[in-house]
């Protein structure tokens, strides 16, 4: 069980590195990072997760991609390290910044799939739609 959690954590951190690289490249190409450039990058990452879902990738992998994209977006939008924090820490931040409530809701649903060996019946299309709605409505 502990080994499984460590492997899952390593996979999440590895994925965050990939997302960071994409955002750095996007920021370099598009100029200074603004909410709109951060939003555009997050939406591209969520589109990539949707493509993975359509290709038949496992729900666990799709949920990991959704979670990483959404946490990275929130981290950049809040100028913090939320993408490196777990769900509990993210929830504590949401108590101070209510904009994070929808992020916590989506990431919580993703974590249920990512970290439960049995997985859960999840509607990845609905989860993706909620993540996209969260990114688009961020102010």
Describe the residue ranges of each PLM region:
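Hydrophobic, helix-length membrane anchors
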Residues: 1-53, 137-139
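Membrane-proximal, non-transmembrane interaction modules
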Residues: 48-51, 57-139
